[in-house]
């Protein structure tokens, strides 16, 4: 048994300069596990609650001293003496201690910091890398990166309504080469923007944030960048889009202000389908708003057999909501964000449910990140086969990519890279 003897939390800053929670879990052996939690900009209404102080005199009300205090008092007292290797029991203890459906009393940010720190401490105690500790002997597969190279929506101060346009190196032979493909496309896009006199400033997730005449202009630019990098669109590098549709869904219509459009769910499905006909798009995330389940059904029936349809705000990493979606044949993939649900155990539950239903899983960062690399290990440990962790700039994003490079090196000849196969539904 590796008993927990202390838990210490602190307020640190994320990549947007906002406070977040970091926790240390100390074991009787002297081992320490440390983890920091991320924070989102566009959030689903049913996400677990991120506890903020609300004190406008500190960090514009975004301080997390209450969550930190909950870790240092109630949570610490509840888990001291527990075996750090019993992740499920530790997480369940914290869930019951909180006592709410959405973790609003203690804060999902408090619970998650401790949950991840416990896993790190347990891995360190076992003398194993985190991906191996969490996944056992099986993990050998690196995820396909979905790299957000044009930012819009809540992630950037520009005129693009859609939140992310991503490049996906489906034709690369390895993760290392996939990262190279992405980096070279990123730099090619920068040159294209620069030559056109457009801004090359970046958004929250490291992608460029230019003002463009239309969303299709973003797709055309990405195709040009892929070709400029000496790669083939659709063969070497495919495209993914995160619409984040909940952000522009009002009064039953999708308001695409940059193009002066107001579309019904059926019309918006036609809009997205036209993109898929013209461009090598293989993944669409949040193609409908989280509350528009009828729209999701229209979209799934229309595109679900040819495109990965990812539910982010739709499912919020919640197995109960995912179960309903599976029963109604809504979407075919789930985005996995650990802070949407608040513990690693519940995260594993959602991933396993998706696998059993033939849904794909995409491990994801948030727009407000830290140097914590847990999600890189999680992607390998769970054999998720896909990861979203931003563009090819900003060290908070590169930390995850670099960790995956290390894991690939450690796995050596046993490492594999699924490429396009990662986007085929299982079952």
From Swiss-Prot:
Keywords: Cytoplasm, Glycolysis, Lyase, Magnesium, Metal-binding, Secreted
Main location: cytoplasm
Residue numbers binding Mg(2+): 242, 285, 312
Cofactor(s) the protein needs: Mg(2+)
UniProt-listed InterPro entries: Enolase, Enolase-like_C_sf, Enolase-like_N, Enolase_C, Enolase_CS, Enolase_N
Pathway: Carbohydrate degradation; glycolysis; pyruvate from D-glyceraldehyde 3-phosphate: step 4/5
Name by which UniProt lists this protein: Enolase
Entry's cofactor comment: Binds a second Mg(2+) ion via substrate during catalysis.
Keyword Cytoplasm appears in the UniProt entry: yes
Subcellular location: Cytoplasm; Secreted; Cell surface
One GO-annotated biological process of the protein: glycolytic process
SMART domains assigned: Enolase_C, Enolase_N
UniProt family annotation: Belongs to the enolase family.
Domain of life: Bacteria
Gene name linked to the record: eno
Gene3D superfamilies documented for this protein: Enolase-like C-terminal domain, Enolase-like, N-terminal domain
Gene Ontology molecular function, alphabetical: magnesium ion binding; phosphopyruvate hydratase activity
């Amino acid at each position: 048994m590796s008993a927990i003897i202390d838990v210490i939390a602190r307020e640190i800053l994320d990549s947007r300069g906002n406070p977040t929670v970091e926790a240390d879990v100390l074991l009787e052996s002297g081992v320490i596990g440390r983890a920091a939690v991320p924070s989102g900009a566009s959030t689903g209404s049913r996400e677990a609650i991120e506890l903020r102080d609300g004190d406008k005199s500190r960090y514009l009300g975004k301080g997390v001293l209450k969550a930190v205090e909950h870790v240092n008092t109630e949570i610490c007292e509840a888990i001291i003496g527990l075996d750090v290797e019993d992740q499920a029991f530790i997480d369940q203890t914290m869930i019951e201690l909180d006592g709410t459906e959405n973790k609003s009393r203690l804060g999902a940010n408090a619970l998650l910091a401790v949950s991840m720190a416990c896993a790190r401490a347990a891995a360190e105690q076992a003398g194993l890398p985190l991906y191996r500790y969490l996944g056992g002997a099986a993990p050998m597969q690196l995820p396909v990166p979905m790299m957000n190279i044009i930012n819009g929506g809540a992630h950037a101060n520009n005129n693009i309504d859609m939140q992310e346009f991503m490049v996906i190196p489906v034709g690369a032979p390895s993760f290392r080469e996939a990262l190279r493909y992405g980096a070279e496309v990123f730099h090619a896009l920068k040159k294209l923007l620069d030559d056109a006199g457009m801004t090359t400033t970046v958004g929250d997730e490291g992608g460029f944030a230019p003002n463009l005449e239309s969303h299709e202009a973003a797709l055309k630019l990405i195709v040009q960048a892929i070709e400029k990098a000496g790669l083939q669109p659709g063969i070497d590098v495919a495209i993914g889009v995160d619409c984040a549709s909940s952000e522009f869904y009002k009064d039953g219509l999708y308001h695409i202000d940059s193009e002066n459009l107001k579309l019904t769910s059926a019309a918006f499905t036609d809009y997205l389908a036209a993109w898929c006909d013209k461009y090598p798009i293989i993944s669409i995330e949040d193609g409908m708003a989280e509350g528009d389940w009828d729209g999701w059904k229209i979209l799934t029936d229309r595109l679900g057999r040819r495109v990965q349809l990812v539910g982010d705000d739709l499912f919020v990493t919640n197995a109960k909501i995912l179960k309903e979606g599976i029963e109604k044949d809504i979407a075919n993939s789930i985005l996995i964000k650990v802070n949407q649900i608040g513990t690693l155990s519940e995260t594993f539950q959602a991933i396993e449910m998706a696998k059993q239903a033939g849904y794909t899983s995409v491990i994801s960062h948030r727009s407000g990140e830290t140097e914590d690399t847990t999600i890189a290990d999680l992607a390998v440990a769970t054999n998720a086969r896909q990861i979203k962790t931003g563009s090819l700039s900003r060290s908070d994003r590169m930390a995850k990519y670099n960790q995956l490079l290390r894991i690939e090196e450690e796995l050596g000849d046993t490492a594999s890279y699924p490429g396009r196969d990662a986007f085929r539904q299982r079952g």
